[in-house]
Amino acid sequence: MDGRRDCRRSVLRRMLRRLPCALLALGLTATLGSAGVLATRRAQELTGRGAVEQPRLNAAYAQGSEGPAPEAETAHPARFATNLTYTSLDAPDDGSAVARVTWDDAWFSADEGDYNHELAQTSSVLAALAYSESGYYQARENHPPYMENALASLGFGEVSTESYRYRSKVVDEVLDLATGDADGAAYTIARKHLGSGHDDPARDLILVSARGSYGSEWLSNLDMSRDEAGDHGGYVRAAREIGAEVVSWAEESRALGAEVSVLLVGHSRGGAIANLVAAELDDLRAQAGDAAPFGPVYAYTFAAPATTLASDARSERYGNIFNIANPSDIMPYLPLSAWGYERYGVDLELPSAGCADFDRLEDEMRAVYRESVGVECSADAADVLIARTVCDNIAAAVGSAEELVTPVGALTTFRLLATHVDPVRILYSHYPSTYIAWMSVTDESQFVPVPN
């Protein structure tokens, strides 16, 4: 008996001695395996293989088919209302939500500097759809191409979501992190022919909807570097990529004899990117004059962080960019204005507690949310006090963006956020669905302009 026990102990000791080597071998295998997966994915990306193919526009989603037939609300034949389906993080079952929107081709011949609340409300849904599209490129058989379906119902004949192909799966996000490529962004670019060329001049609308923070892209929010114009380093690379694509599409339309209007939308990081694209196009148009390949630029952003240190960000040149923020949402306060950060264009705040008729508006917003998303809205208007207090405390403790990236600045900021902010609760005010519900029950007269 003792001999067998000694034998077992001897075997156990040998196993324990080998355990570190075994664990090391497993670690090396996992590391090499992961490296192999990333190398394979990188090769696929470079050769255009191994990704979900871009969907074609679905003919079943004819103009207005997601809801009742297009409504002849005015004499303009291109004006109608329809339902658009998008996804929300808190929606039950398949995660889908429905929003009623209006569309009017005449919007894109009007003055770009005049705020258009109907266009803004529709833009809030188009911004949310940028997130919804990701599911198609992750699991093609289980998720419809929400963006293509929505834009087909709005009459767009050409839609590209090509940029999602290698920016939607987990392996893509890990690869972007490994290659330092996390500053990019997935986006949709689309074209709709507006004018007939008879009574109205031929006009094309080019739409861009930029996706917000996704996977490793979230880290670019923390990139406090800036370019020569003072624009946020974590957003500017994606903005330049999209801006170049818009110019290319506009030149194609111009070559075919069409005037060109541009619509830019985005939520959160996508809103910041859309903000910079709009400013870039405004600058290009100011420099090129009539030689610019596009005319009016309409930009509507939602929950966008601040984007620039440029001293002229609020100048008249950028008066066509409208940035809509929920005052209970902490993201639009960052990076802090105390550090000199702004957004290009005009900032507008949704109603907050204490505003005239707020209780009625909030009740209406919650009713719309419940009907659209299928659950109660968990956003709390009282979070405006938390958001502003935390930001004031950070500004008092951390004097600049440069100080933020020091160990002391980073730890101080983290401590203040961890002490005062419930990350789950505060995000409810940031949800695209919360913005959509608010946009559905308000108009511009109830917004609070943010002073320059």
Task: List each model region and its residues.
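N-terminal Sec-pathway targeting helices
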Residues: 7-25
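Hydrophobic core
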Residues: 24-28, 32
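Sec-dependent signal peptide cleavage junction
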Residues: 33-51, 62
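A conserved cap/lid and substrate-binding interface adjacent to the catalytic center
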Residues: 153-265, 280-298, 314-318, 322, ...
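Gly/Ala-rich beta-loop-alpha elbow adjacent to hydrolase catalytic centers
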Residues: 266-270, 274
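Short, hydrophobic alpha-helix immediately C-terminal to the catalytic nucleophile
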Residues: 275-279
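The feature captures the conserved acid-bearing segment of alpha/beta-hydrolase catalytic domains
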Residues: 291, 296-379
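Long, charge-rich alpha-helical interaction segments
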Residues: 358, 362-451
